């Protein structure tokens, strides 16, 4: 194989590859020998079909298969031997090819630019620890206790008030006619939360057991059966039970039920949990600071093809007119994203950072925990969307790079109060929409839902740099 590299304008190169016909014929002979072992042709014993017969029967198909393999193998080798990293898929132009002929082709590529890695020890970022006072811990424990309240049935003549649990059967009609989904049994509502159809539960205030109550509402715009959306409906509700919540006593027994040794231990765990909530959000802010610092590193030139691909991603879902108006802004965002991505990749390669299959699966499991009850849907999504799984792998890779940078850099360590943390995060949230740092472009994730109350201890979400912290179980480290 002969390879000639011709430099074009900027990062563009033409790589000419020549393979003589003797080498091509040896590839063909290997393939014929491979096929001869398995092919069955009338009049010939298995493994004894002559090459000329195979050539007449399968020659064109075999050559196409061999050509694909040779192009793949030789193009990769040509790039590796010349230490060329392409930005995107190379374009192949076949000049000469065919059975019993030389193979000659030109591979046109845009090369990844040279990246100058500064010493990461110079990167500056803030590392916060949040001091949580006892009042905040006690407040959170009370909220947890409230979420654990038990409901006990009240006397048949007691009328329902806000925060009571009402259980009922219903039959609904639109313009006096039954409709799909208009019937329910043992429906449960906590009055005052307005979690069913808007304005529904307040009409049940004052009902008692065995009452029949008529409720008029307008079905929501996102009603599952679209033909009924925004229509007025009448619900005839048969009240089967009214229950009142009983406060849970906050003591050692309560703490043990939540997995703690005693109440004192629970306070330690909850305090740590609150601190972790803020830490997770503040860590995202630190990541943003690091990425902003990396923007100051030098990259000779940004490949135009990568900019174009990134602009297409940013323009997804927009009209052609809006896309044109935003073009200049999108190009600037694209250049920043690509530049930082190139630098992170170079840092990752130099430090031999790898992502294992176990780490990818751990990230998938993290996604599953965020969407309880929809685990099957999430798994199927990743199985059917390899690009989404690749994006997830990219997320893990970037996080490992950022974590390593944090260990090498010298952070400015600061202890702050909860109020100061909220102020910092709020300020960052205001600026967040102006700073794009999502280098993995995770456009393929399934729609996320908030975690349900399936864990023993529920967190109260706090403000964060980009979104509220997720619900997690309190655990000891």
From Swiss-Prot:
Entry GO CC: cytoplasm
Signal peptide range: none
Residue ranges of domain PPIase FKBP-type in the record: 163-248
Highest taxon of source: Bacteria
Molecular function in Gene Ontology: peptidyl-prolyl cis-trans isomerase activity; protein folding chaperone; ribosome binding
Keyword Chaperone: yes
Protein family: Belongs to the FKBP-type PPIase family. Tig subfamily.
Protein name (Swiss-Prot/TrEMBL): Trigger factor
Species of origin: Pelagibacter ubique (strain HTCC1062)
């Amino acid at each position: 194989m002969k390879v000639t590299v011709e430099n074009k304008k900027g990062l563009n190169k033409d790589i000419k590859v020549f393979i003589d016909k003797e080498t091509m014929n040896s590839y063909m002979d290997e393939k014929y020998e491979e096929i001869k072992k398995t092919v069955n042709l009338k009049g010939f014993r298995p493994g004894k079909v002559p090459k000329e017969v195979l050539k007449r029967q399968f020659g064109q198909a075999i050559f196409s298969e061999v050509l694909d393999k040779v192009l793949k193998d030789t193009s990769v080798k040509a790039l590796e031997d010349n230490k060329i990293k392409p930005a995107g898929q190379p374009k192949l132009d076949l000049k000469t090819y065919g059975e019993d002929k030389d193979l000659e082709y030109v591979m046109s590529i845009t090369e990844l630019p040279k990246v100058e890695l500064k010493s990461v020890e110079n990167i500056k970022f803030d590392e916060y620890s949040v001091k949580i006072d006892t009042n905040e811990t006690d407040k959170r424990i009370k909220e947890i206790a409230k979420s654990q309240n038990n409901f006990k049935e009240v006397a048949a003549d007691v009328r329902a008030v806000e925060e009571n649990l009402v259980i009922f059967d219903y039959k609904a009609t639109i313009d006096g006619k039954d409709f799909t989904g208009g019937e329910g049994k043992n429906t449960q509502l906590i009055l005052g939360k307005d979690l069913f159809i808007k304005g529904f539960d307040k009409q049940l205030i004052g009902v008692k057991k065995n009452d029949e109550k008529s409720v008029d509402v307008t079905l929501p715009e996102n009603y599952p059966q679209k033909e009924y959306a925004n229509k007025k409906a009448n619900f005839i509700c048969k009240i089967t039970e009214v229950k009142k919540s009983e406060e849970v006593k906050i003591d050692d027994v309560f703490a043990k039920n939540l997995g703690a040794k005693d109440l004192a231990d629970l306070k330690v765990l909850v305090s740590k949990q609150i601190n972790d909530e803020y830490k997770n959000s503040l860590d995202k802010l630190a990541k943003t600071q690091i990425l902003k610092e990396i923007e100051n590193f030098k990259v000779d030139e940004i490949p135009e093809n990568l900019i174009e691909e990134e602009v297409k991603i940013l323009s997804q879902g927009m009209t052609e007119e809006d896309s044109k108006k935003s073009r200049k802004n999108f190009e600037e965002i694209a250049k920043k994203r690509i530049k930082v991505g190139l630098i992170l990749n170079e840092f990752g390669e130099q430090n031999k950072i790898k992502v294992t299959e176990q780490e990818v699966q751990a990230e998938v499991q993290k996604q599953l925990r965020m969407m309880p009850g929809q685990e099957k849907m999430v798994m199927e999504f990743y199985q059917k969307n390899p690009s989404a799984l690749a994006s997830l792998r990219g997320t893990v890779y970037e996080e490992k790079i950022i974590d390593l940078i944090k260990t090498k850099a010298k952070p400015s360590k600061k202890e702050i109060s909860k109020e100061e943390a909220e102020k910092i995060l709020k300020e960052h949230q205001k600026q967040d929409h102006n700073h794009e740092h999502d280098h993995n472009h995770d456009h393929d994730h399934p729609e996320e839902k908030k975690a349900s109350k399936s864990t023993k201890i529920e967190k109260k979400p706090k403000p964060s740099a980009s979104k509220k912290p997720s619900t997690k179980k309190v655990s000891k480290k």
